[in-house]
């Protein structure tokens, strides 16, 4: 079988069409429902962050060792400031922020979050101030962990840094950002919050519908499986929807990175409803489309 894998997301492939580059031909070859979904997504504000398609490469040595045809989608090189797969998600969050004429973005994540660091870099690109909230998710971390890596880059990118002590309290972390946003509004600023908790629609998941279209445009044979990390759930849901549109024979499997399979399944069930509403098709993704694996969770 065929598998494609990236640092944060693993994917599988099948041939179909990529929008917007092949938008017209794609509409001619997919169902009316799928075409309506693409039409809905195309009307949602988006800011370009990826300058080009990311590579899809075959892993010859691993393929031979495992006796499979294994590929990797290199979304680790997507976007500015050392890249990362969250660039696809941020295209839609910054699309919404620019549409609202925001001058400040607020985001929360782990202390060494790539998502947070990439958001800070994108804020510079779009002329916005970044306020990043770093959550204490690692017990007894040393000063190097607290100050180096992405934390240092956040400082260099000019972000204001806040700290939140409860690393697994997503609703509380979001509430703190919304309270900070209200303070900014009182000062005449226009903030935009990029939320983390499952209580908000996963807007960033739309980026991986486009990502699935890109994958299928780069290959001539269909993949059987797509394997992705499943944490917040946005990348996982976007790929599940995108492959259902462009490569319905492929099974998307989420490898749990933060919580056991049962807890992650509950989270994704909750997010699926708001995601389906977002794409204008209330019954598009169902529990049958969500597959999880947690054997490597530690």
PLM region spans:
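PLP-dependent amino-acid enzyme catalytic core
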Residues: 25-298
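A composition/secondary-structure signal for short, hydrophobic, low-basic-content segments
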Residues: 1-3, 85
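N-terminal cationic leader/targeting segments used for protein routing and processing
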Residues: 15-16, 22
């Amino acid at each position: 079988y065929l598998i494609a894998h990236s640092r944060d997301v693993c994917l599988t492939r099948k041939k179909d069409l990529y929008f917007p580059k092949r938008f017209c031909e794609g509409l001619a070859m997919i169902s009316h429902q799928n075409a309506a979904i693409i039409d809905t997504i195309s009307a949602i504000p988006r800011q370009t962050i990826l300058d080009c398609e990311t590579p899809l490469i075959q892993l010859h040595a691993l393929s031979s060792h495992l006796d499979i045809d294994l590929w990797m989608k290199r979304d680790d090189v997507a976007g500015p400031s050392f890249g990362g797969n969250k660039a696809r998600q941020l295209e839609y969050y910054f699309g919404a922020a620019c549409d609202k004429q925001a001058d400040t973005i607020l985001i929360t994540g782990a202390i060494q979050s790539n998502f947070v660091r990439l958001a800070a870099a994108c804020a510079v690109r779009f002329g916005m101030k970044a306020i990043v909230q770093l959550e204490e998710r690692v017990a007894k971390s040393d000063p190097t962990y607290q100050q180096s890596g992405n934390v240092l880059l956040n400082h260099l990118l000019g972000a204001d840094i806040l700290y939140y002590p409860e690393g697994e309290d997503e609703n509380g972390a979001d509430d703190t950002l919304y309270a900070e946003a209200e303070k900014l509004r009182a000062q005449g600023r226009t903030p935009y919050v990029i939320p983390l908790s499952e209580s908000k629609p996963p807007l960033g998941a739309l980026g991986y519908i486009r990502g699935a279209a890109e994958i299928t445009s780069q290959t001539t044979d269909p993949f059987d499986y797509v394997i992705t990390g499943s944490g917040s759930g946005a990348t996982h849901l976007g790929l599940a929807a995108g492959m259902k549109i462009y490569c319905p024979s492929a099974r998307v499997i989420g490898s749990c990175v933060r919580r056991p399979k049962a807890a992650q399944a509950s989270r994704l069930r909750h997010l699926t409803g708001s995601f389906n509403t977002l794409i204008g098709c209330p019954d598009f993704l169902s529990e049958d489309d969500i597959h999880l694996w947690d054997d490597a969770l530690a």
